Curated annotation (Swiss-Prot):
GO cellular component: cytoplasm; ribonucleoprotein complex; ribosome
Protein's UniProt name: Large ribosomal subunit protein bL21
Protein's job: This protein binds to 23S rRNA in the presence of protein L20.
Entry keyword set: Ribonucleoprotein, Ribosomal protein, RNA-binding, rRNA-binding
Alphabetized SUPFAM superfamilies for the sequence: L21p-like
């Protein structure tokens, strides 16, 4: 059984027991969270596709950890003009473990 749900402007395909990395959620570590924007639920040969959301579809998860991703560097450069700017960015994330999928 798997489901596709939307969180943080992205769509994620998950199954029970899977741990995924999402955009930062303002929920404490160890707490439960429910995602109700479920786009699709598949259970064997039975596939339930929403229009746009599955009615009554819920993905339940538990927050495992919060953190920051790898640093990316942004460079702005003009040749021969002695001009260079460099900037870094680390995006916040939340790791969640999927505990249940229901339709």
């Amino acid at each position: 059984m798997y489901a596709v749900f939307q969180s943080g402007g992205k769509q994620h395909r998950v199954s029970e027991g899977q741990t995924i990395r999402l955009e930062k959620l303002d929920i404490a570590t160890g707490e439960a969270v429910e995602f109700d924007q479920v786009l699709m639920i598949a259970n064997g040969e039975e596939i339930n596709i929403g229009a746009p959301l599955v009615v009554g579809g819920v993905v339940k998860a538990e927050v495992v950890a919060h953190g920051r991703g790898e640093k990316i560097k942004i460079v702005k450069f003009r040749r021969r003009k002695h001009y260079r700017k460099q900037q870094g960015h680390r995006q916040w994330f939340t790791d969640v473990k999927i505990t249940g999928i229901s339709a």
